[in-house]
Amino acid sequence: MYEEFIKETSKFIFAENKPEKADIIFVPGNGYSQMAERAAQLYAKKYAPFVLPSGKYSISTGRFGGVLTGQKRYSGEYQTEWEFLKDVLMKNGVPADAVLKEDQATFTWENAKFSRKVTDQAGINIRKAIICCKNYHARRALMYYQRAYPDAEFRVCPCCVDGITRDNWTESERG
């Protein structure tokens, strides 16, 4: 019974889809480069015309916690998660005019809610979107973005960070 519980919980938390053509790619804020790198790959393959990284910093620290992966390549003096993620996107081939700006969010619901304000102000109607996030953050990100964009369809294209996967998340405190 415990194994079935873990299996079903893992399936729920670690939401993942194959990418499809979309109106935008969302990247909730953090200090990991992988999600923005994945978004840049999807942009290069023409999955969406815009990428919207979102984030000021974590509400729990009150400052940008720094670059957690890719420090050699992304060595700027970043004040916000958005500044960092924009740099990652641009260094991976996404032009500045395809990167939208949301730099006030301090937690996941704000990432989604404030991103909605940005797309509404830009006149971008979101019918389908891709979310590039941490794999163990996938369900939470999906639920918040669905709440902010109730009429949109979402594809979650997560990245593995911290070595945490659906197969091992129960084996560590971090998972």
Language-model features, listed with the residues they occupy:
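A structural signal for short, hydrophobic/glycine-enriched beta-strand patches
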Residues: M1-E173
